[in-house]
Amino acid sequence: MSSTSTSSALIHHFRLTTRNLGSPTKQRCPYAVTFCNSWREAGLRYSVTQRRSKGFGPVSALNDDDSPTETTPGVGSAVEDRPPDSSEDRSSSVYEFLYPRKEELPDDKEMTIFDHLEELRERIFVSVLAVGAAILGCFAFSKDLIVFLEAPVKTQGVRFLQLAPGEFFFTTLKVSGYCGLLLGSPVILYEIIAFVLPGLTRAERRFLGPIVFGSSLLFYAGLAFSYWVLTPAALNFFVNYAEGVVESLWSIDQYFEFVLVLMFSTGLSFQVPVIQLLLGQVGVVSGDQMLSIWRYVVVGAVVAAAVVTPSTDPVTQMLLATPLLGLYLGGAWMVKLTGR
């Protein structure tokens, strides 16, 4: 190549017309050349000997025929390129969940990691504020709540005692905390949905509403079932078992520890159909597969009831295992009816 001594301040773009390839002939190679800071940044495909023999500074060469036609998404882009559909597994629901199509993605603006952290901080603050206000409101009516929660065994002649100074006060704080968390849970749920909603596809957004509504309904149904059925049955079993031998004088703190743990664990265990629907929509397991293992589910429901319930009596365990088994079978049929 012929060398031309020209000031770099006057030339911003020039084209190399010929390049000596080490043979008597010369080939014309249209390259767009721009000045760069280093050979590594330039990315020229010259050998070390060729680089040292050049008389000009570092340049970057780009073939006109190889020019990119579209911009590659940069770091922090919310859209991840789909891998090529080279196998049959790529058409599964799991693949569609991990790599959604671009037309399914929402048209929301992208945010930096710092913007996400700031939004998360604000939503956590709102959730904590709502739960704190609910706890204060429940503490103002804590005595009424305690009388309401004592109702399942009041007719059995059970007497509650304060066995240590301040035990009743700390019990009211515990009851207020549980009830405040229960009343503030809708706000927490809303903030979680508002935070993750921009990152969901349109299909996932349509699926989110029924899932949230069903989960909330099942949780409160579990609380009601525990208060009206499970707790009275368990406590009556203990009272009748001790009848004629010892008088039932219960610690107020231990009683509410038992009742509150039983109620909330029952509410959480009622989320089984929601988990099944999520697994079915993602494509991890089908409805037929869920129904085919019903024998193992029976054993698992009994074991789960024994772990979840704070008591060790068989009555409470069977009362909880029965609805768990029914919820599982109902969830499996729902997954099957949805075509999964």
From Swiss-Prot:
It comes from the Eukaryota. GO terms for biological process: double fertilization forming a zygote and endosperm; thylakoid membrane organization. Residues 79-91 have a biased composition (Basic and acidic residues). One of its GO terms (molecular function) is proton motive force dependent protein transmembrane transporter activity. According to PubMed:18930082, TATA is detectable only in minor amounts in Arabidopsis chloroplasts. In thylakoid membranes, TATC and TATB form a large receptor complex, containing about eight TATC-TATB pairs, which binds the precursor protein. Twin arginine signal peptide promotes pH-triggered docking of TATA oligomers to TATC-TATB receptor complex, inducing a conformational switch of TATA that results in activation of the translocase. TATA dissociates from TATC-TATB upon completion of translocation. GO terms for cellular component: chloroplast; chloroplast thylakoid membrane; receptor complex; TAT protein transport complex. It is found in: Plastid, Chloroplast thylakoid membrane. It comes from Arabidopsis thaliana. Residues 57-92 are annotated as: Disordered. Belongs to the TatC family. NCBIfam families: tatC. Residues 61-127, 201-209, 279-289, 336-340 are stromal. Residues 149-179, 231-257, 311-314 are lumenal. It is a multi-pass membrane protein. Part of the twin-arginine translocation (Tat) system that transports large folded proteins containing a characteristic twin-arginine motif in their signal peptide across the thylakoid membrane. Involved in delta pH-dependent protein transport required for chloroplast development, especially thylakoid membrane formation. TATC and TATB mediate precursor recognition, whereas TATA facilitates translocation. PROSITE patterns: TATC. InterPro entries: Sec-indep_translocase_CS, TatC. This is Sec-independent protein translocase protein TATC, chloroplastic. Pfam families: TatC. The chain crosses the membrane at residues 128-148, 180-200, 210-230, 258-278, 290-310, 315-335. The gene is TATC. Its main location: plastid.
